[in-house]
């Protein structure tokens, strides 16, 4: 009997079962203990294979692939700390709804807690973050193949969002020629091998429920808050709010076109918050709100009803409003709750939004990060997409720009970490095949620097803007102690990215003005390669410009 041959047959059942649940992209890191899984994936023609030497980046690559494809994406890693490196991507997926299938190879039980190399306690190591966790036994013919495939089917068939951790112990030998060991075990699944359906068919229950009193509430004074959603949903929400005559406060990730732009500025004006107090109902569609003033208003508002509609489960309301948490697909929910044509009830807010935008435009000429945030919509590629990093950059775009309705925008705004942003952007580009503009800060770029290796493989032009303000300048917006701010918060690194781009053979530009930036863009969009554009700016100018605009708009 060949242990290595049966390991591979066991793994082949697992991998084939994944294909029945829409898995097409599979991300693989190098490793020996994962050999049965890797070879089974390599032999299965249903998969598109992606590889990376860094498991943390690999997890985020899978996250980006899942964001665009809307399908589960599988990840294969070897045992030990390689598994732990998947934690950040798993956490993010749990908060933003992407489906990740983590296949983690493991040592067999007799090698755990006895000093064996690269052997750690892997079952349960992700605690409550996976939606499902499966600790498989060591491969054995004593367990029927139908148990293995139905176990996989149960976890994936009931998966609505988040990650599944499948821990797969394999005993040595891991290498060897295939023979007939386990062939009859494998063949007991019969014509399942020629079928394309799961062995066990289950489906998560997610049905939009109509609110029977909607006809009553839609005649009231309402406010629509739009969080993270798809491009198509964003366009529908904008039209829905316009028909109702309700003001729409759109997040940078809402893709609604933000009809009342610069909300993070005008929400700091007492006239705006006073007018919003007249709202009898707030309907929030989508979660993960960005703007500080929006979150402050959300926490303090007290309408008669506060509804949150999102297909992700959980409360999603840090302010704990009295109201309704409606778990539903946004587009489906809108169909069940049609708008009734009414005149807009807000008068002051549209005027403030226009004046706030004019205040931003008046400052657009200086070459800085706040001005770049405002101008970013001028640089979006046609038929493309935008990936926005975290920390200061996403807040500036949210506050100072007005992205077009229906233009795809992606980000990691679940746990809002700066780890894995370049890797996620790489996955977003690969899954879509579209021209992509990605924008991150210098610390975010440093954090995921080896992901530049992933950006060597793009199918359409990708431009990575690194806004180099020499540290974590978001802390300039916070009341951090002045005496310790630079050393313990900003942590300036005094680096540039020309040599990093050269190491991975990526094109590089460092423009000094808007004309040079536009020339760099024009060159970048011509070829299906990655271009790194480093925009070096004065350290605190972006944060200071935002603070000045907030003060100016608050007194309009």
Curated annotation (Swiss-Prot):
Cofactor note: Binds 1 thiamine pyrophosphate per subunit.
Alphabetic keyword roster: Magnesium, Manganese, Menaquinone biosynthesis, Metal-binding, Thiamine pyrophosphate, Transferase
Enzyme class (EC, first level): transferase
TM annotation in the entry: none
Induction: By isopropyl-beta-D-thiogalactoside (IPTG).
A biological-process GO annotation: menaquinone biosynthetic process
Protein's recorded name: 2-succinyl-5-enolpyruvyl-6-hydroxy-3-cyclohexene-1-carboxylate synthase
Species: Escherichia coli (strain K12)
């Amino acid at each position: 009997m060949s242990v290595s041959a049966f390991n591979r047959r066991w793994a082949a059942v697992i991998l084939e079962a994944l294909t029945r649940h829409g898995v097409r992209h599979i991300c693989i890191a190098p490793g020996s203990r994962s050999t049965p899984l890797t070879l089974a994936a390599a032999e299965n023609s249903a998969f598109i294979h992606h590889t990376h030497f860094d498991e943390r980046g690999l997890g985020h690559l899978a996250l980006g692939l899942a964001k665009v494809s809307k399908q589960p994406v599988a990840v294969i890693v070897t045992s030990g700390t390689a598994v732990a490196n998947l934690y950040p991507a798993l956490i993010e997926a749990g908060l933003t709804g992407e489906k990740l299938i983590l296949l983690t190879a493991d040592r067999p039980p007799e090698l755990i807690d006895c000093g064996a190399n690269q052997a750690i306690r892997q079952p349960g190591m992700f605690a409550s973050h996976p939606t499902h966790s499966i600790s498989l036994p060591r491969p054995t013919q004593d367990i029927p193949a139908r148990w293995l495939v139905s176990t996989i089917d149960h976890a994936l068939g009931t998966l609505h969002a988040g990650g599944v951790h499948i821990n797969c112990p394999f005993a040595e030998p891991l290498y060897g020629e295939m023979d007939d060991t386990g062939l009859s075990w494998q063949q007991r699944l019969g014509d399942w091998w020629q079928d394309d359906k799961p062995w066990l068919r289950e489906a998560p229950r997610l049905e939009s429920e109509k609110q029977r009193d909607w006809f009553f509430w839609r005649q009231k004074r309402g406010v629509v808050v739009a969080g993270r959603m798809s491009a198509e949903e964003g366009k529908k929400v904008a039209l829905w709010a316009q028909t109702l005559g309700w003001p729409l406060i759109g997040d940078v990730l809402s893709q609604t076109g933000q009809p009342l732009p610069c909300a993070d500025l005008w929400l700091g004006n007492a006239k705006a918050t006073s007018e919003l107090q007249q709202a009898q109902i707030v309907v929030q569609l989508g979660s993960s709100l960005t703007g500080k003033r929006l979150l402050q208003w959300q926490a303090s508002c007290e309408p008669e009803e506060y509804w949150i509609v999102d297909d992700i489960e959980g409360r999603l309301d840090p302010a704990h409003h009295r109201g309704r948490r409606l778990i539903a697909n946004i587009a489906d929910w809108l169909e069940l709750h049609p708008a009734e044509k009414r005149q807009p009830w807000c008068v002051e807010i549209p005027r403030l939004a226009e004046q706030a935008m004019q205040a931003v435009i008046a400052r657009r000429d200086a070459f800085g990060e706040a001005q770049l945030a405002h101008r970013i919509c001028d640089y979006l590629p046609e038929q493309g997409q935008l990936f926005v990093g975290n920390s200061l950059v996403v807040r500036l775009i949210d506050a100072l720009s007005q992205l077009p309705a229906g233009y795809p925008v992606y980000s990691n705004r679940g746990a809002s970490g700066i780890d894995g942003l370049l890797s996620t952007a790489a996955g977003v580009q690969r899954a879509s095949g579209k021209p992509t503009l990605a924008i991150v800060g210098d610390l975010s770029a440093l954090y995921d620097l080896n992901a530049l290796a992933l950006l060597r493989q793009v199918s359409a032009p990708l431009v990575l803007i690194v806004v180099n303000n020499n540290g974590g300048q978001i802390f300039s917006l916070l009341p951090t102690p002045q005496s310790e701010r630079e050393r313990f918060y900003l942590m300036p690194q005094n680096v540039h990215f020309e040599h990093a781009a050269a190491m991975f053979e990526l094109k590089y530009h460092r423009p000094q003005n808007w004309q040079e930036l536009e020339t760099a863009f024009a060159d970048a969009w011509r070829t299906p390669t990655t271009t790194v554009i480093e925009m070096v700016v004065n350290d605190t100018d972006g944060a200071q410009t935002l603070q000045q605009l907030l003060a100016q708009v608050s007194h309009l």
